[in-house]
From Swiss-Prot:
Species annotation: Aromatoleum aromaticum (strain DSM 19018 / LMG 30748 / EbN1)
Single GO molecular function: structural constituent of ribosome
Bias (Basic residues) ranges: 45-61
Protein name (Swiss-Prot/TrEMBL): Small ribosomal subunit protein bS21
Family: Belongs to the bacterial ribosomal protein bS21 family.
Length: 70
């Protein structure tokens, strides 16, 4: 579990902001949301496969030339 040390004379809001930033960097919240409910292995494979297809289409769109406008 990530933690921070509150500096002397540091406002509470700043300490909370630093804590949120460290949590975001470690990816703890995203992992927690992913593990919140059980996902069947087939559903997980299907979701990952769909994400891979989406990434592939996005990469292909950026690599292709724009259509000629004449």
């Amino acid at each position: 579990m990530p933690g921070i040390r509150v500096k002397e004379n540091e406002p509470f809001e700043v300490a909370i902001r630093r804590f949120k930033r460290t949590i975001e960097k470690t990816g703890l919240l995203t992992e927690l949301r992913a593990r919140e409910f059980y996902e069947k292995p087939t559903a997980e494979r299907k979701r990952k496969s769909a994400a891979a297809v989406k990434r592939n289409h996005k990469r292909l769109r950026s690599q292709t030339l724009p259509p000629k406008l004449y």
